[in-house]
Each structure stands twice: as structure tokens, then as C-alpha cells.
Amino acid sequence: MKLLVISSAPVVELDGKLHLYAPYEKEMQLWAKHADTIQFCCPIWKQDRKLLIAPISFEVNSIVELQEFDITSLSNKLKAIPFAFVALIKIFKAMRQADHIHLRCPGNIALLACLVQILFTNKQKTAKYAGNWDP
């Protein structure tokens, strides 16, 4: 199974190693047991922002990097338009290749993925609600 994980939760790259938010990494260990390949579609952080992280303990085949964005001010709303458009295209291309689509909600990126997944009626999908959403 080709698993695609779409999330606003970042992959953190430190010293050439990939990390995830620690509880998220434990959850993904379960998914990794049932997937032949795992692809992430999410933001990538290149520095430690004091998030509780753990090294990824399974093979990640690829990461489609998405730009983080928020809509908390007028200027951010204007900036979000091109970011969202590019994200929609990247999410669509990633979904085309996947056998199973896993949305990790809430978040702006998962919201976009919810819209795109409508086009893939025959693909298996799951959604995980992982906490509060503060756009």
C-alpha cells in the first residue's frame, strides 16, 4: 500500500535526520507496519522550534514540501492565496499516486486536502483529529 500522509504538522530536519512531533511519530509507527511506502505532504522545518520531537523510526520514501500559512491578518490572508493554490496542486499530484490517503486534522493544509480528496472517490481514506486548531 502506498500511504500518503497530509498534515500541517511539520517534518523537522535536524543534522540530516528527520523528526516528527513525538506522539505523531508513535502513531505513524503503527501505519508504517501496514504500508509499503510512506509519503508525507507537509511543511518541513530546518531548525528546532522547541516542539517535542522524536526521530522517525521508519522509512520515509518522499516528502512533498508545503508552505505553512495562516489567515490571522489581512496581509496573511492575501499571502495565503498563492500558497493555497500551490498546495492544492501539490496535494492533487500526491493523491493521484497514493493507494491510501491519511489526513491529519485539524489545520489549513488538511482543510485543503479535504477539498481535493473529493476528486478521488475510489481511494481509501482516513482522517485523524489531533487537537485544537488555531488558524
Label each region the model flagged.
Residues 1-52:
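N-terminal subdomain of nucleotide-sugar transferases
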Residues 6, 41, 66, 128-130:
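Generic beta-sheet signal
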Residues 11-12, 77-100:
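Conserved nucleotide-sugar donor-binding subdomain of glycosyltransferases
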Residues 37-74:
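N-terminal strand-loop element at the rim of the active site
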Residues 19-23, 82-83, 134-135:
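Nucleotide-sugar donor phosphate/pyrophosphate-binding loop at the beta->alpha transition
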Residues 84, 100-121, 127-135:
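An aromatic- and histidine-rich active-site surface loop
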Residues 35, 60, 97-99:
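Short, well-ordered alpha-helix to beta-strand connector turns
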Residues 10-15, 71-75, 128-135:
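A short, histidine- and acid-enriched strand-loop-helix "catalytic/donor-clamping" loop
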